[in-house]
Amino acid sequence: MKSNGHPSNNSINEPIKQQETKQNNKSSHKTPHKPPYLARAKFQPKTSSFSNSSFQSSTPPKPQIALKSPSPSPSQPKTSSSSYSSLSSPSPSQPKTSSPSLPSSTPPKPRQIALKSPSSSSSSQPKTSSSSYSSLPSSTPPKPQHIELKSPSTVKKSPIVKKTNSPKGSKFKKTIRSSRSTRAGLTISVSRVEKLLRGRRYSKRVSPTSCVFLAAVLEYMVLELLELSLNELSLSKKSRRIKNRHINLSILKDVELSALLNDVIICSGGVLSSIHPSLLKLKKDQ
């Protein structure tokens, strides 16, 4: 209300209050003080590595082929989108071998892999290109070798056997092991005579030559006895085998053997028959 042409206190205070309320509102909306690294990040737009559209789309992104300058190493072909579908198949198809690609100015075309049924993929084998066969050398089967059987006579004359033998002009000769009896030319073994001499201990020392002489004497005596006993066997005409009786008669009739073996008694050898000649039936010639 106006009175006496002067404004009231309320009308004067209203604009002041409005200014104060505006200042209070501004102070309430002021953001707190932030560090410089957060203030910089405010103006940088946030970008995600993967867009929302990539998760929503079911099909994978198509690979982009970049043109490259020809290099000495052969460039490998990139697979197309059909390769992703081939991985989800129940049985993976076997790779096909191809001839090595030569370096060219044009980029290689992507290789397409065709899907096959499980039955065909199991029976299919890796195919090789015709150029790989042409590069290989022509292989012919080896001819069968004929084997000849040789007789024993031809084997001895073969040069392989001659090489294994010792040379003709060899200085060393093969030594044949022989006993002392064979070297002395005796049938009675000298080693056995030596064993008996050393076992009976007739003397303290036994020379190696004494055994040889004793074996020679024994062999001579045995030969004499056998010769005389054969003569007695031929006179008896009753048996064809030398017996004790024949040996005893041969010793008693021989002068040297009877003097040597006078004290020897031969079992079942008998005695000399001492019959008077008048009792004997003499023949007409006697």
Curated annotation (Swiss-Prot):
Q: Which InterPro entries match?
A: Histone-fold, Histone_H2A, Histone_H2A_C
Per the record, the GO terms for biological process are:
heterochromatin formation
- GO CC terms for this protein? nucleosome; nucleus
Q: Gene3D superfamilies, per this entry?
A: Histone, subunit A
One of the entry's Gene Ontology molecular-function terms is: protein heterodimerization activity
Bias kind Low complexity: ranges: 44-59, 76-104, 115-138
- Composition bias type Polar residues, residue spans: 1-26
Where are the annotated segments for Disordered?
A: 1-180
One short Pfam name that applies is Histone_H2A_C
Q: Family membership, please give it.
A: Belongs to the histone H2A family.
Q: Per its record, how is this protein called by name? A: Histone H2A.v2
Q: Which species does this protein come from?
A: Dictyostelium discoideum (Social amoeba)
Lineage of the source organism?
Eukaryota, Amoebozoa, Evosea, Eumycetozoa, Dictyostelia
